[in-house]
């Protein structure tokens, strides 16, 4: 018999006694009975990994006295499809069917209320759809800016110091649920990160130098921001970038990233432009100030990309356009084994695809995600399985 304690985001504890041979699915069933929900809504996390239903308690390494974090997702609302009854055909006027003609008024009268029922159900269906959109919008994911500060304050109310909370959020890529899990269970060694570089007050107060005559791009469109900044500073990128870096006191072409981040960004831009947007999203989640920094200094960002791809910005923008149009990244073990990473298609690219990568991708697919999506996120996260799982659950879970 193994005694385990299950905790959630609110630090509610649910003790359960299990057999080592019990599967995770059986464990979820017992836990669901204790907290009054369905086992399909429960996710169990231990040591930074989502436990699979098919494995047993002993196979997951759970021992007597261990603590497991559980998260309960919102129950999907099911819409009942209302089918409109067929309209009664007009009665014939032939002499042989006079009886049916005489009976038609009563039939039409009884069919009228039934025909109006679907019309009355339309607002209810619209209300259900609105409720689903609201629930989807409120699903917790990455938090940045003011929302991140509010999250820190809420977690501090649980008894943690601000430094501990910020460290956990950085390790969890700004995912509140995962950060609380790390505070309860400890941050894995491979996710411990050094303190981020503090941005100077001059950089925060520096006004944007983008041209005011051109139409401003959407706030969330980093590519349009960067492209507009590149056009505005065409022919003078070196001068503008040098002035910006001099004001910030940093090296040329620096926008506050670590060396590892720059290497990953340049590698993705050079060999796989389609994965640039997921990588930027991942980096922005770890460095909340990066997004504002790029929008305030688009010319520095463009200069860095140009340096990475040899002044061929068109390839980067075409890769981003292809990604938006829905092209998928296709990587197969056979192609990698035969050294065929570079195909004939325009969207092909070469990657190191090992059997370990195939196993990791298969495990992520077992969580219920499409293989094409898993491959994109997995390689965008530099083959970090835990980071890929975090992004999949945060941004792509239904």
Swiss-Prot record:
One of its GO terms (molecular function) is polyubiquitin modification-dependent protein binding. Residues 146-186, 355-395 form the UBA domain. The lineage of its organism: Eukaryota, Fungi, Dikarya, Ascomycota, Saccharomycotina. The keyword Glycosyltransferase does not apply. Present with 10900 molecules/cell in log phase SD medium. This is UV excision repair protein RAD23. One of its GO terms (cellular component) is cytosol. There is a cross-link at residue 49 (Glycyl lysine isopeptide (Lys-Gly) (interchain with G-Cter in ubiquitin)). Residues 101-140, 229-249 have a biased composition (Low complexity). Residues 1-77 form the Ubiquitin-like domain. It comes from Saccharomyces cerevisiae (strain ATCC 204508 / S288c).
